[in-house]
């Protein structure tokens, strides 16, 4: 009820202004009696995945807390894991505004943010100060002005800087809002990137005395053959997990709705079916050799269960969380 009232107010604002205000409020409320508005005690539903123990299988997807400013608030909501980022080596402003749009009738969002963030060093400082009990994922990307042929260097820089502080590292090569980025999902480009990341992981594991798993985040807009090739690369390079999926460029489900023609990636309920299908195809190809984190359109316990039945060991929410609030996390965890 409280969240429904708050949402009514937030939805009167421009989508990005509402997001920024929410982040500020989470920072302001953290550690004060006001955090009772979102703090909740959830039952333990432990899951072993990628060599880590998650207190429950419901995580926050990357993109909501790009700079790691609200880890403690999301931890207090009971998430089993929180993924911050996407973060890049250098700060960047992202694409021009407006760049975030609600499709309220479809419970969807279109964004063309463009990896706006304050840089990896800023994020690391925030993580170092935060106190939390959930698993922390850090999602890394490349700067917009880094040529795609040099993209691996950006991922390696970020990986080196976040390694010590991450529970796992998510490699984002599937955002539709950085020109050319999705080309890294295919063929030799993917193989070379994963090989370099794996070598860096071995080097950093020895240096820090701990193994931090790597998960690749992929797009929903892939053919069956492309999914098969990605699976082959993941197994060949001993990557630890795969996150499926990012946002979609497809507008079929929302055609004719307000904002449907805005450029960017579509998330929320309209991507639910396709992302679940990608999870299913990944599971068919990978079996139990590699864990899958399912994300895309999870707005209820039923939607989360569908992802798990398709083969996901963990799930993440973002757009569903915007529309339904912390109660969504509670409902999923309690019903598992």
Swiss-Prot record:
EC number annotated for this UniProt entry: 1.3.5.2
Gene Ontology MF, one: dihydroorotate dehydrogenase (quinone) activity
Pathway: Pyrimidine metabolism; UMP biosynthesis via de novo pathway; orotate from (S)-dihydroorotate (quinone route): step 1/1
Biological processes per GO annotation: 'de novo' pyrimidine nucleobase biosynthetic process; 'de novo' UMP biosynthetic process
The protein's required cofactors: FMN
InterPro entries: Aldolase_TIM (IPR013785), DHO_dehydrogenase (IPR050074), Dihydroorotate_DH_1_2 (IPR012135), Dihydroorotate_DH_2 (IPR005719), Dihydroorotate_DH_cat (IPR005720), Dihydroorotate_DH_CS (IPR001295)
Binding site for substrate: 66, 111-115, 172, 177, 246-247
Sequence positions that bind FMN: 62-66, 86, 139, 172, 217, 245, 268, 297, 318-319
Main location: membrane
Annotated membrane topology: Peripheral membrane protein
Catalysed reactions, as listed in the record: (S)-dihydroorotate + a quinone = orotate + a quinol
Note describing how the cofactor binds: Binds 1 FMN per subunit.
Annotated GO CC locations: cytoplasm; plasma membrane
Superkingdom, taxonomy of origin: Bacteria
Record's subunit section: Monomer.
Record family assignment: Belongs to the dihydroorotate dehydrogenase family. Type 2 subfamily.
Purpose: Catalyzes the conversion of dihydroorotate to orotate with quinone as electron acceptor.
Protein name: Dihydroorotate dehydrogenase (quinone)
Natural source organism: Vibrio parahaemolyticus serotype O3:K6 (strain RIMD 2210633)
Protein encoded by which gene: pyrD
